[in-house]
Amino acid sequence: MNVQIFGTKKAQRYFKERRIKVQFIDLKEKEMSKGELTSVMQAVGGIDKLLNPKAKDEETLALIQHLTSSQRFDKLLENQQVLAEPIVRNGKKATVGYCPDVWGAWE
């Protein structure tokens, strides 16, 4: 299992308690690459599932809602502070939000 966690320590703790090695990436320090974001977007079913409706940057969030799909992706790539967290990847699978039931099925 090759697990990558973008975001919260709570998700990291879940895997640590089960002695599963993870790669933790703090989105405040290092943003997702275009390829990583594309992979996650395809795995979860689109950009809308990646957006955090309670994000502090309400202007960017509102703007993203009114752009074309390619513009939305580019804007999201530039402004990753509106992503819902945690984003957890395991190969081609991914989840957005705290999803221990799904992660348990990965084990």
List each language-model region with its residue ranges.
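Local sequence-structure signature of Cys/Sec-based thiol-disulfide redox active-site neighborhoods
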Residues: 1-30
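Thiol/selenol-based redox catalytic cores and closely related redox-interacting motifs
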Residues: 30-107
